[in-house]
């Protein structure tokens, strides 16, 4: 093995540095075998006699050369091994870099662009060949047009040359513009969707917040201006606006304000420090830089971002659904007001001059923005009676509200039929049953006792009317479906109730009497669960291991409520016993 490595590494090189040229024979790597053959040069009789001398120095020199050769072989082998290790490491690093580069660069997009460039190249080549053919055809026709009369041929040649020059000049001047109007097939580009990433979701929410910050600041300043947050600023703005509308300068005033804003933005982009707002008292909130977060804190951050996105999408959906329902006559009495207003505006535009209409609209907008809205915001009862836009907007329903109204109407019809005795068995009052899931959804708070088979007086405490979403971990059970269950935890005056979200009946719900609880304490299950894995452990005589209500986002609030009610009930029981 050593000799094969030696042949690969030092092929064709002389090992002159291992054996002395004078005292050792010449040998090459290609001649290396099991034994080192000695090449005997032609010597004289005297030299032969010296070599035959057993006490001569040649044998000692040869032995030292062989030892030196063996030692350098091991050093050389170690060197080759080191180079191989370095090469393997470099190969690994280069493979990692190549993989990262392939992930960062979009190969499909580059291939599409390359295909487009190839198509353009073929089109250009086709155009060049067409132009060359036309030129050859023109030259052929010119040669054929030469007749016996030289005068007529010369005139035709001049005319064709002139036409060709005019055509070439026209193509050079306007050919590019003509090519722009050439119809081409529409290109269908497929955008690659990015995979779901918690980091990208958080970054997009921050980008959205930064992008909407100028708009939100502008709306806040306008609201402060309408609320007379700064009396002097609002008074000056009101006087300037009304004067501009009265003299017909409203549009030039808004254009001048837009130019002023762009000029200030230009100075800010150039490095000037300008903090300018409509109302000086309204200050911007500064975001503190966040430090390195742990895994649980990052998970909590993702939950917060998801909650913000959910609320934002919900508000946007409410606005769009209200606008749709306004125009689709879902609430006829509200759409009727808009309908009458549009007819009045149409009739006024037909009989009055646009200058008069613009003056009236501008004066009404100024009075409404600076005076009427200020009074309505200070007097809510007056606003609920006379503010027509506010009444229309708040009265418009969203699609979920319409669905709830439909379900409530159908449930009332069922209750009416039940009260008349037309149905032998139906769902209990205030409860609408979903047949697909087999679960009773309560429509009134009084049906809470029916879910857990409790007295009607048992209702959730005010601090937990909606309950706390969590998962029940019953360590006494071995089946996965019984070991952990998702649901909602409630606390009443005397019971701790857990409603399973996937229960087909009340058998999977859990009801624990507060007086039966022997111990209650905070418990941390797993850091990757929501709420940093925080939970509450409850010990009872009927369970060998404590029941754990884990994955609670608001664990501290729930623990304080449950523990205070537990202490209250146990103290009342001990006092009654004594």
Curated annotation (Swiss-Prot):
Functional description taken from the UniProt entry: Plays a role as a mediator of e2f1-induced apoptosis in the absence of p53/TP53.
Name of the protein in question: GRAM domain-containing protein 4
Residue ranges of the TM segments: 236-256, 334-354, 356-376
Residue span, GRAM domain: 446-524
Residues in coiled coil: 83-135
Keyword list, A-Z: Apoptosis, Coiled coil, Endoplasmic reticulum, Membrane, Mitochondrion, Transmembrane, Transmembrane helix
Chain positions covered by the region annotation Disordered: 132-157
Locations listed in the record: Mitochondrion membrane; Endoplasmic reticulum membrane
One CC-aspect GO term: mitochondrial membrane
Predominant place of localization: mitochondrion
Domain of life of the native organism: Eukaryota
GO process annotations (BP): apoptotic process; negative regulation of toll-like receptor 9 signaling pathway
Organism: Xenopus laevis
Disulfide bonds: none
Topological category with respect to the lipid bilayer: Multi-pass membrane protein
Biased composition (Polar residues): 139-154
């Amino acid at each position: 093995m050593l000799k094969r490595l030696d042949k690969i590494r030092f092929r064709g090189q002389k090992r002159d540095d291992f054996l002395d040229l004078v005292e050792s024979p010449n040998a090459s790597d290609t001649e290396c075998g099991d034994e080192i053959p000695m090449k005997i040069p032609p010597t004289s009789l005297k030299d032969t006699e010296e070599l035959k001398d057993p006490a001569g120095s040649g044998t000692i020199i040869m032995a030292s050369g062989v030892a030196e050769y063996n030692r350098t072989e091991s050093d050389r082998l170690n060197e080759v091994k080191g180079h191989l290790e370095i090469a393997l490491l470099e190969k690994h690093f280069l493979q990692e870099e190549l993989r990262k580069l392939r992930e960062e660069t979009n190969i499909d997009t580059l291939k599409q662009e390359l295909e487009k460039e190839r198509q353009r190249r073929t089109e250009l080549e086709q155009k060049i060949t067409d132009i060359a053919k036309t030129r050859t055809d023109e030259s052929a026709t010119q040669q054929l047009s030469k007749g016996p009369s030289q005068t007529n041929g010369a005139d035709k040649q001049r005319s064709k040359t002139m036409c060709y020059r005019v055509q070439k000049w026209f193509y050079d001047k306007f050919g590019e513009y003509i090519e722009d109007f050439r119809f081409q097939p529409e290109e269908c580009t497929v955008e690659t969707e990015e995979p779901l990433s918690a980091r990208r979701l958080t970054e997009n929410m921050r980008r959205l917040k930064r992008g909407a910050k100028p708009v939100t600041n502008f709306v806040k300043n306008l609201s402060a201006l309408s609320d007379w947050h700064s009396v002097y600023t609002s008074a000056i703005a009101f006087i300037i606006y009304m004067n501009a509308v009265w003299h017909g300068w409203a549009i030039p005033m808004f254009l001048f304000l837009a130019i002023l804003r762009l000029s200030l933005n230009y100075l800010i982009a150039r490095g000037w420090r300008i903090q300018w707002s409509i109302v000086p008292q309204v200050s911007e909130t500064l975001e503190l830089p966040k430090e390195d977060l742990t895994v649980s804190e990052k998970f909590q951050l993702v939950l917060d971002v998801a909650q913000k996105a959910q609320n934002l999408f919900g508000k946007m959906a409410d606005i769009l659904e209200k606008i749709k329902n306004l125009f689709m006559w879902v609430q006829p009495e509200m759409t009727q007001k808009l309908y009458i207003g549009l007819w009045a505006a149409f009739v006024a535009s037909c009989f009055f001059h646009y200058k008069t209409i613009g003056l009236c609209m501008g004066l009404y907008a100024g009075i409404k923005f600076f005076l009427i809205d200020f009074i309505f915001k200070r007097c809510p009862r007056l606003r609920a009676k006379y503010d027509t836009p506010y009444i229309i907007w708040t009265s418009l329903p969203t699609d979920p509200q319409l669905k709830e109204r439909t379900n409530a109407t159908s449930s009332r019809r069922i209750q009416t039929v039940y009260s008349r005795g037309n149905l032998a068995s139906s769902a209990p009052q205030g409860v609408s049953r979903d047949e697909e899931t087999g679960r009773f959804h309560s429509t009134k708070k009084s049906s809470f006792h029916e879910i857990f088979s409790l007295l009607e007086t048992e209702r959730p405490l005010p601090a937990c009317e909606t309950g706390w979403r969590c998962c029940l971990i019953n360590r006494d059970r071995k089946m996965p479906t019984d070991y952990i269950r998702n649901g909602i935890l409630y606390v009443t005056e005397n019971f701790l109730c857990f409603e399973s979200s996937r229960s087909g009946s009340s058998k999977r719900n859990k009801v624990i009497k507060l007086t039966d609880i022997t111990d209650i304490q905070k418990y941390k299950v797993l850091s990757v669960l929501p709420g940093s894995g925080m939970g509450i452990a409850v010990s009872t005589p009927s369970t060998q291991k404590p029941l754990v209500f884990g994955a609670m986002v608001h664990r501290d609030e729930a623990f304080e409520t449950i523990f205070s009610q537990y202490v209250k009930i146990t103290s009342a029981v001990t006092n009654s016993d004594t």
